[in-house]
Amino acid sequence: MIISDTSVITNLISIEHIFLLQALYEKVIIPQAVYEELSRCHPLFLSEIQAEKSPFLEVKTVKDKNKVYELKQQAKLDNGESEAIILALELKTDLLLIDERRGRAEAQRLGIRITGLLGVLLEGKTRGFVVAVKPLMNKLIENSTFWISPLLYDKILLLAQEKEGE
């Protein structure tokens, strides 16, 4: 079972690779707060998903709203991140897709296995759904607010076996 925060989805939409979520994971669960964030920034995408006979995004409601509130306050996370982390705990998820540094740190502290957008792209390449990761990272940098440090950029190229001269 895979749960996602908003940023992985919005960034995959921005580079026109949202299909990767369904190709890699078949179904991805999002908490209500993530659905609401997506409905504000990508309403057309959500209406297209809802029109599908078997949508790959499934919305689930967090049971313990108090834990969400506590996590928001203690870790200084937004609603989507907080609900995604608590839902991951409640559903004992296999993997949480999350990019924000604080959210990732909190999820790991709570014992949740995580990956982010770059991990999704790498898995997409490994499994043959993506030809090359480098042009997708470049498109992310150009078309969104996604930031990749030069060190991480090089590390991802190395992992994707796209580093020139090596």
Predicted segments with their positions:
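Acidic, PIN/NYN-like endoribonuclease modules and their adjacent C-terminal/linker elements
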Residues: H42-L44, R104-E166
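Active-site-proximal, substrate-binding regions of enzyme catalytic domains
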Residues: M1-D94, R101, L110-I112, L151-D154, ...
